[in-house]
């Protein structure tokens, strides 16, 4: 019953906040590539995000997402998924000086043939996960909420935003993993108009928690669960039958932005953030086993012209992430107390993504088109200190995309997106103490390296049709998209996406 009420709530969120019928200009403002060029950078500041859009727009829709890989590119993520979601999104311009936006969603689905991972949020917590060699299909449920508000007074702008996620992932056959996640992010931003530029600063804070356990119900016995520590290593003292743990962490970040007030000129973005996550063993009085640290820096600088009917943008970007992991040295227990006698920084990981991207387009109130491209260098280096283990790969990549949006009549509009990309490996290497590794761990590491150093090619397409009901505030839309990825290891991935909904 709770799910039914929640889905009903999604369908009503935007209905009672809609103020005007959807126009072509509103559809373009919220979906055009060039209008959302800085969505992943400057729009992380809610003061910029809330006042960058001018027209009210809401969507309520259901969507389905299917992905299949002929062999898992990442064992810990499985061979694909089937997900269905109900979602409502709205943006309201409350006045010339204020705006509010929000979203609510419910997702459910299944992930296929997951192995070497019994924890949720693998991308975030890797390598400090609970894992076994058997695995299986996992089910998931996710609730998401987001809300923000921005206001301007004179030359000052202020914004605030909250993003919340609650997720439950589980398996109903042995090994019966379960992960329950709560994740809350708060953002506060401010901006000031000075000279020909808007100067902005923002703060971000995150709180994260996950409870994680694995159970066995069948009489055939149990298999060991490994407390993984990176590149095929485990904390052997606490592996085996210790299967209940939890993660606790979060962090903070700061971002700075400069944007031309007339939408023509140089712009820049910088962000620094730090996060950390503790893994604690609930079976042994919550003794902390490991701690994972993130330190990241993002820098972007470019020039744009977004005024009038022609749009041009070019920028250079650098993303650097350093991850390091501490393993606690735990003494002998005394009355269920496990003293920490020291710690060692054993795992190190360096990620670099630097790229140049550009856009050229044309737009008006009834239609728009644009071409966008991206070329870059990506590098991932991992190291485990002792016994020494190393894995690294570097790629050069390029992507070319295009978008066409047009009103075919007073009631029908069409949007088409297409893209092609290629990731080519330029260097790779691995160092492993294979003589001292279990056969199953060798196979897992070799599979990881095989797909990390592979070349990838991608083709994608998406088409969306909008129909505006005559004399009504409501519009209907249908969207169909997909992509095809080929891998130099003679494997492939296909992905399909379908969405149906209403706009107002």
PLM regions and their residue ranges:
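Outer-membrane beta-barrel "beta-signal"
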Residues: 25-26, 492-504
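N-terminal, post-signal peptide beta-strand-biased segments of exported outer-membrane/organellar beta-barrel
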Residues: 20-112
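Transmembrane beta-strands of outer-membrane beta-barrel pores
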Residues: 64-70, 106-110, 151-155, 164-168, ...
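Long, internal scaffold/assembly segments composed of regular secondary structure
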Residues: 233-373
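Outer-envelope beta-barrel architecture signal
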Residues: 54-60, 96-102, 154-160, 195-201, ...
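Outer-membrane beta-barrel translocator domains and adjoining extracellular loop/strand segments
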Residues: 70-77, 113-119, 170-178, 212-219, ...
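Residues on the lipid-exposed face of transmembrane beta-strands in outer-membrane beta-barrel proteins
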Residues: 86-92, 145-151, 186-192, 254-260, ...
């Amino acid at each position: 019953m709770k799910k039914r009420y929640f889905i009903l709530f999604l369908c009503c969120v935007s209905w009672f906040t809609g103020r005007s019928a959807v126009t072509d200009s509103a559809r373009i403002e919220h979906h055009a590539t060039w209008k959302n060029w800085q969505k992943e950078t400057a729009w992380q500041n809610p003061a910029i995000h809330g006042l960058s859009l001018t027209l009210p727009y809401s969507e309520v829709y259901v969507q389905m997402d299917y992905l299949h890989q002929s062999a898992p590119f990442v064992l810990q993520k499985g061979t694909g998924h089937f997900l269905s979601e109900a979602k409502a999104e709205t943006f309201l311009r409350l006045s010339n000086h204020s705006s509010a936006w929000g979203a609510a969603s419910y997702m459910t689905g299944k992930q296929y043939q997951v192995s070497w991972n019994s924890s949720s949020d693998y991308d975030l917590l890797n390598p400090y996960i609970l894992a076994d060699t058997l695995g299986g299909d996992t089910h998931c449920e996710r609730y998401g909420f987001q809300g923000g508000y921005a206001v301007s007074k004179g030359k000052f702008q202020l914004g605030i935003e909250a993003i919340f996620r609650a997720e439950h992932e589980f398996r109903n056959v042995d090994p019966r993993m379960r992960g329950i996640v709560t994740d809350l992010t708060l953002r506060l931003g401010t901006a000031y108009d000075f000279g020909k530029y808007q100067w902005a600063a923002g703060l971000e804070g995150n709180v994260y928690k996950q409870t994680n356990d694995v159970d066995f119900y069948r009489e055939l016995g149990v298999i060991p669960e490994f407390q993984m520590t990176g590149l095929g290593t485990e904390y052997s003292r606490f592996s085996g039958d210790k299967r209940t743990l939890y993660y606790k962490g979060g962090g903070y970040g700061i971002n700075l932005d400069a944007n031309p007030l007339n939408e023509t000129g140089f712009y820049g973005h910088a962000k620094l953030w730090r996060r950390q996550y503790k893994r604690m063993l609930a079976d042994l009085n919550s003794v902390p086993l490991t701690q994972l640290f993130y330190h990241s820096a993002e820098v972007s600088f470019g020039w744009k012209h977004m005024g009038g009917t022609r749009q041009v943008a070019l920028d250079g970007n650098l993303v650097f992430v350093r991850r390091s992991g501490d393993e606690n040295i735990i003494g002998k227990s005394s009355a269920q107390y496990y003293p920490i006698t020291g710690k060692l920084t054993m795992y190190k990981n360096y990620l670099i993504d630097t790229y140049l991207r550009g856009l050229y387009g044309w737009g008006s109130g009834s239609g728009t088109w644009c071409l966008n491209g991206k070329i870059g260098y990506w590098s991932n280096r991992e190291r485990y200190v002792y016994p020494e283990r190393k894995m690294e790969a570097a790629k050069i990549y390029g992507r070319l995309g295009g978008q066409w949006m047009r009103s075919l009549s007073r009631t029908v509009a069409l949007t088409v997106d297409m893209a092609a990309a290629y990731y080519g490996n330029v260097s790779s290497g691995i160092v492993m103490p294979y003589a001292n590794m279990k056969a199953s761990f060798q196979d897992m590491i070799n599979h990881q390296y095989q797909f990390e150093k592979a070349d990838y090619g991608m083709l994608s397409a998406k088409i969306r049709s909008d129909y505006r009901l005559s004399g009504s505030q409501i519009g209907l839309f249908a969207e169909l998209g997909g992509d095809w990825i080929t891998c130099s290891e003679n494997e492939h991935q296909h992905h399909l996406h379908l969405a149906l909904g209403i706009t107002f």
